[in-house]
Amino acid sequence: MTKNINQPVAYPIFTFRWLAVHGLAIPTVFFLGGITAMQFIQR
């Protein structure tokens, strides 16, 4: 597979990786932010 690094791919691998990273990172940050907010609300 190392020989095909310079070859253009037929499928948008970078777009798929971007959607995968942001699709998981954004809800995770929002979820952690919500838990942190609830910790201050309870006190």
From Swiss-Prot:
It comes from the Eukaryota. Pfam families: Cytochrom_B559. Heme binds at H22. InterPro entries: PSII_cyt_b559_bsu, PSII_cyt_b559_CS, PSII_cyt_b559_N. Its main location: plastid. The chain crosses the membrane at residues 18-34. GO terms for molecular function: electron transfer activity; heme binding; iron ion binding. Keywords: Chloroplast, Electron transport, Heme, Iron, Membrane, Metal-binding, Photosynthesis, Photosystem II, Plastid, Thylakoid, Transmembrane, Transmembrane helix, Transport. With its partner (PsbE) binds heme. PSII binds additional chlorophylls, carotenoids and specific lipids. One of its GO terms (biological process) is photosynthetic electron transport chain. It is found in: Plastid, Chloroplast thylakoid membrane. The keyword Cell membrane does not apply. Its cofactor is heme b. One of its GO terms (cellular component) is photosystem II reaction center. The keyword Hydrolase does not apply. SUPFAM superfamilies: Cytochrome b559 subunits (SSF161045). It is a single-pass membrane protein. This b-type cytochrome is tightly associated with the reaction center of photosystem II (PSII). PSII is a light-driven water:plastoquinone oxidoreductase that uses light energy to abstract electrons from H(2)O, generating O(2) and a proton gradient subsequently used for ATP formation. It consists of a core antenna complex that captures photons, and an electron transfer chain that converts photonic excitation into a charge separation. Belongs to the PsbE/PsbF family. Heterodimer of an alpha subunit and a beta subunit. PSII is composed of 1 copy each of membrane proteins PsbA, PsbB, PsbC, PsbD, PsbE, PsbF, PsbH, PsbI, PsbJ, PsbK, PsbL, PsbM, PsbT, PsbX, PsbY, PsbZ, Psb30/Ycf12, at least 3 peripheral proteins of the oxygen-evolving complex and a large number of cofactors. It forms dimeric complexes. This is Cytochrome b559 subunit beta.
